[in-house]
Regions:
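Conserved MFS/SLC helix-loop-helix module at the cytosolic interface between two early adjacent transmembrane helices
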Residues: 60-96
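Helix-breaking motifs and short loop linkers at transmembrane-helix boundaries and internal kinks
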Residues: 42, 73, 94-99, 128
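Conserved glycine-rich helix-kink/hinge and helix-boundary motifs of the Major Facilitator Superfamily
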Residues: 17, 49, 79, 132, ...
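Short hydrophobic/small-residue motifs within alpha-helical transmembrane segments
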Residues: 55-57, 143-144
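Helix-loop boundary and gating motifs at the non-cytosolic
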Residues: 10-48, 52-53
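Paired small-residue
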Residues: 88, 99-107
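Small-residue-rich segments within alpha-helical transmembrane domains of MFS-like 12-TM solute carriers
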Residues: 24, 28, 109-117, 147
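Cytoplasmic helix-loop-helix junction between adjacent transmembrane helices
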Residues: 104-142
Length: 149
């Protein structure tokens, strides 16, 4: 018995998965550099913990971002978000003040929220009938990023 499902486009699936890897690797930089930031800025445990909270707060907008993703071309979000997150996270070491750290992490958080809402939608489009396989590659990219970061 043959399967009538379309084969999917493995190249595009791998491209979206690679984008997930590239996006999430700099996102994982906060934990290793946090002790350095604590020393540099004399942060309390509360202030240090708040930095990660600030980075995650934009995820509360995910339902709204999903509505936006349903109405506009999402390709640009997937292209721009990894670079924006990498730049914001890379500048943490150059931040002159705690407030700048907060702003950089907020930018990284918004970029992350936009990416993580739109990339699975793109994966569904490029997987063409093999959504499970596509999403498994997508998730692999994210897990490898946490390992590398």
């Amino acid at each position: 018995m043959t399967e009538d499902r379309p084969r999917g486009n493995l190249g595009k699936v791998l491209a979206v998965s690679l984008a997930h890897l590239v996006h999430d690797t700099p996102s994982a930089f906060l934990a290793p550099v946090l002790p350095l930031l604590i020393d540099r800025f004399g942060l309390t445990v509360f202030m240090a913990g708040l930095l990660d909270v600030v980075r995650r707060i934009p995820a509360l907008a995910n339902p709204f971002l999903g509505l936006v993703a349903d109405r506009i071309c999402i390709r640009w979000f997937i292209i721009i978000a990894p670079g924006l997150t990498a730049v914001a996270m890379s500048f943490l070491g150059l931040a002159p003040a705690y407030a700048v750290l907060v702003i950089l992490l907020l930018v990284a958080g918004v970029s992350s929220a936009v990416f993580h809402v739109t990339a699975p939608v793109m994966m569904r489009h490029v997987s063409t009938g093999r959504i499970g396989r596509g999403m498994s590659f997508y998730m692999l990219g994210g897990e490898l990023a946490r390992t590398l970061g």
